[in-house]
Curated annotation (Swiss-Prot):
Its EC number is 6.1.1.11. Catalyzes the attachment of serine to tRNA(Ser). Is also able to aminoacylate tRNA(Sec) with serine, to form the misacylated tRNA L-seryl-tRNA(Sec), which will be further converted into selenocysteinyl-tRNA(Sec). This is Serine--tRNA ligase. PROSITE patterns: AA_TRNA_LIGASE_II. Transmembrane segments: none annotated. It holds the Pfam family Seryl_tRNA_N. InterPro entries: aa-tRNA-synt_IIb, aa-tRNA-synth_II, aa-tRNA-synth_II/BPL/LPL, Ser-tRNA-ligase_type_1, Ser-tRNA-synth_1_N, SerRS_1_N_sf, SerRS_core, tRNA-bd_arm. It comes from Leuconostoc mesenteroides subsp. mesenteroides (strain ATCC 8293 / DSM 20343 / BCRC 11652 / CCM 1803 / JCM 6124 / NCDO 523 / NBRC 100496 / NCIMB 8023 / NCTC 12954 / NRRL B-1118 / 37Y). L-serine binds at residues 238-240, 292, 391.
């Protein structure tokens, strides 16, 4: 949620910055007009309440003097009726203001590239392991290079057919070494983040609608969520929701900041509007595992912490020796709550393209305002914290990248060295028979 006081004082700037995010400036005019009406009403109500107090005093005085107070009593009733009418009007205005404000995205940080969509994203850096060039398919696409889902099916470790039979499209079973590889990947990720000072959590996977509102998924993205029928609850689209809401409504001790959490969770997404995209494989599923990172920071530290969190995600890819690049998203491609976002995209040799594997964002105080998460600054004034979140990483997409980047011509897949301790020293995935 944006700061309405800032919007009042800086309406021209806010209109310009939100126009970069796709918001019609007239929407801001409408919001500020309703806000002004609401404030005028509040003043009227306060004035009437003062008048009511005066009349009440007059009635009490008249009664003490045994004088006729009927006129004052009538006046009192009229003032009471006027207050009630204005209160109802104010409630309606409050709802209208809230409804518009709840649909406004965050303003982008000033250094974010301005543009309508992903075409305006800017590459920050790219990385590939030195030995990557010696992999046979790294420099030119070898004829035997297969897509991760073909490799997984040939090895008997990914079963999309039975996933579809039991649950529908975009679901799968990990089988045998596939399940072990997925587990190895997320345990490795969690261990790395723990070493970087993140507290590991296991969170609920069903949250209240208020939690979805707090992180900015609701009200705008309800169509993409799996709702629990008959309850105001939702299956989480990311562990960002329960992790960030952990402190909703709380004041955090200043000396504890930054606070860093990490969690593995299943994520559930309807993928509304993705018909025809990535219909095969692990890239776009309705249910997938993801390791999430979340931070609560002081405002002056949040951008330094954003850079650190991005490096924490990159660290995983570097230790897995997977090539990637980092891009900063433009104003037209950023998520609803973000003020600045880095996407990390991993190299997928069969598609000959980089694919998103992590998104790391600073939401500044946008989420904290919705959730009322505060701390006291050096002057002992209550301030909103800044919240950050990032994937560290999407587990299925990491498995997909490993299968494609570590595949061998004989159909086997070499297991990255850092994962071998999690797989009892196993060095390769080879075809197995299962029914």
């Amino acid at each position: 949620m944006l700061d309405i006081r800032y919007m009042r004082k800086n309406s021209a700037e806010v209109k310009q910055r939100l126009e970069y995010r796709g918001v019609n400036p007239e929407t801001i005019d409408e919001l500020l007009e309703l806000d002004q009406k609401r404030r005028d009403l509040i003043q009227k109500v306060e004035s009437l309440k003062a008048q009511r107090n005066d009349v009440s005093d007059k009635i009490a005085f008249a009664k003490r003097q045994k004088e006729d107070a009927s006129e004052a009593i009538l006046q009192m009733k009229q003032v009471g009726a006027d207050i009630k009418s204005l209160d109802n009007e104010q409630t309606l205005l409050d709802e209208q203001v809230r409804e518009i404000a709840a649909h406004l995205p965050n303003m982008a940080a000033f250094d974010v590239p301005v543009g309508p969509d992903e075409s305006a994203n800017v590459e920050q850096r790219k990385w590939a392991p030195e030995e990557y060039g010696s992999r046979p398919h790294a420099l030119e696409e070898a004829s035997w290079v297969k897509a991760h889902y073909e490799i997984g099916e040939n090895l008997g470790i990914l079963d999309f057919e039975r996933g579809a039979k039991v649950s529908g499209a975009r679901f799968l079973y990990y089988v045998g070494d596939g399940a072990r590889l997925e587990r190895a990947v997320y345990n490795f990720m969690l261990d790395e983040h723990r070493q970087e000072g993140y507290t590991e959590m296991i969170t609920p996977i069903v949250v209240n609608d208020s939690a979805m509102f707090g992180t900015g998924q609701y009200p705008k993205f309800q169509d993409d969520a799996y709702r629990v029928e008959g309850l105001n609850q939702t299956y989480i689209p990311t562990a960002e929701v329960p992790l960030t809401n952990y402190y909703s409504g709380e004041e955090l001790p200043s000396e504890d900041l930054p606070i860093k959490f990490t969690a593995l969770s299943p994520s559930f997404r309807k993928e509304a509007g993705s018909a025809g995209k990535d219909t095969r494989g692990l890239i776009r599923l309705h249910q997938f595992n993801k390791v999430e990172m979340v931070k609560f920071t002081k405002p002056e530290d949040s951008y330094e912490e954003l850079e650190k969190m991005t490096l924490d995600a990159e660290n995983i890819l570097q230790k897995l020796n997977l090539p990637y690049h980092v891009i900063v998203l433009s104003t037209g491609d950023m998520g609803f709550s973000a003020a600045k976002t880095y996407d990390i995209e991993v190299w997928m040799p069969q598609q000959n393209v980089y694919r998103e594997i992590s998104s790391v964002s600073n939401t500044e105080d946008f989420q904290a305002r919705r959730m009322h998460i505060t701390y006291r600054d050096a002057d002992n004034k209550l301030q909103l914290v800044h919240t950050l979140n990032g994937s560290g990483l999407a587990v299925g997409r990491t498995v997909a990248a490993i299968l494609e980047n570590y595949q061998n011509e004989d159909g086997s897949v070499t297991i990255p060295e850092v994962l071998r301790p999690y797989l009892a020293g196993q060095e390769k995935l080879e075809p197995t028979t299962h029914h």
